[in-house]
Amino acid sequence: MSHRHHFRVGPVGFRVASDWAGPIADLKRLYADYPTLEGCAATATARIEAARPWRRWVRPAVHIGGDYTIPDALPLPLSQGLLAAEMAMNLQVALGWRQHLLLHASAVERDGRAIIMVGASGSGKSTLAAMLGEGDWRLLGDEFAMLGLDDEQLSPFPRLISLKNESIAAMVACVPPERLGPIITGTPKGIIRHLVPRADAIARMDERATPALLLFPTFGGEAGLRPVPPSEAFMRLTDSSTNYVALGEPGFAALTRLVRDVPAVAIGYASSDQGVAAVEALWAELEA
């Protein structure tokens, strides 16, 4: 493949290759401020490629590959090439990373302490993280929270934030256009647009944080909150982890310490602004 880009996000060094120039051009623009891999080996290789040579030009169909693949995954149209590249990068980390316990979660930090937000697609965790990250919080990650196996510290993984549908307009109004990727339509999740994290999140990607609150958000439901007991938090987090089973005892120990030491709360909210206000109120109580 003649089109490539190498860069680092937190502890992961990515080598991304493509049969097409367009997706790599998008990656180079959006990841322009991330460190390169000069003199360092990549820890994850992602590829987006044509199923057959002629599919580079005739009805291009983008297949996701790399160190790890899903053989029966359906191809994407070339118009969704950036999304395919991001999905390929996610796949390599989800299936291959063993240095941390991975939680499918977003996370933000303030004063060295972090909130981990866990929820299914549509729960609003990405939008909450994006909005908090534009305020007094530092974004640690949108896709994965990386928990240390020995020290309970979160390693930042500030990839592009995947904005979806209504959340796009909310963020477009408050960030400069150069931090936004192309509008991607026709995806299974609707309209997607990627947002580059603020400069401080990228510059401080090697500064870890201590988990201080586990949050389980639900967007669109009845407003309110309830404490989540450690047993329930443990089960929810095992469901959200992509490598808990593969890690074995170290993963179990890390997750047990997390739910033992960190309070957990479930919140419902009807709007993003209401969600942000609820998070800030919870944080104020935690610090009181």
Where are these regions (language model features)?
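Short, P/G- and charge-enriched loop/turn segments at secondary-structure junctions
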Residues: 93-96, 200-202
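Post-Walker A alpha-helix
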Residues: 128-129
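A short, compositionally biased
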Residues: 1-3, 57-58, 102-104
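Pre-Walker A adenine-sensing motif
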Residues: 94-110
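Acidic-aromatic/histidine active-site loop/patch
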Residues: 34
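Charged, amphipathic alpha-helical linker segments immediately N-terminal to NTP-binding catalytic cores
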Residues: 42-94, 283
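Glycine-rich, often acidic-flanked micro-motifs
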Residues: 2-29, 41-43, 106-119, 134-288
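Conserved glycine(s) of the Walker
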Residues: 123-124
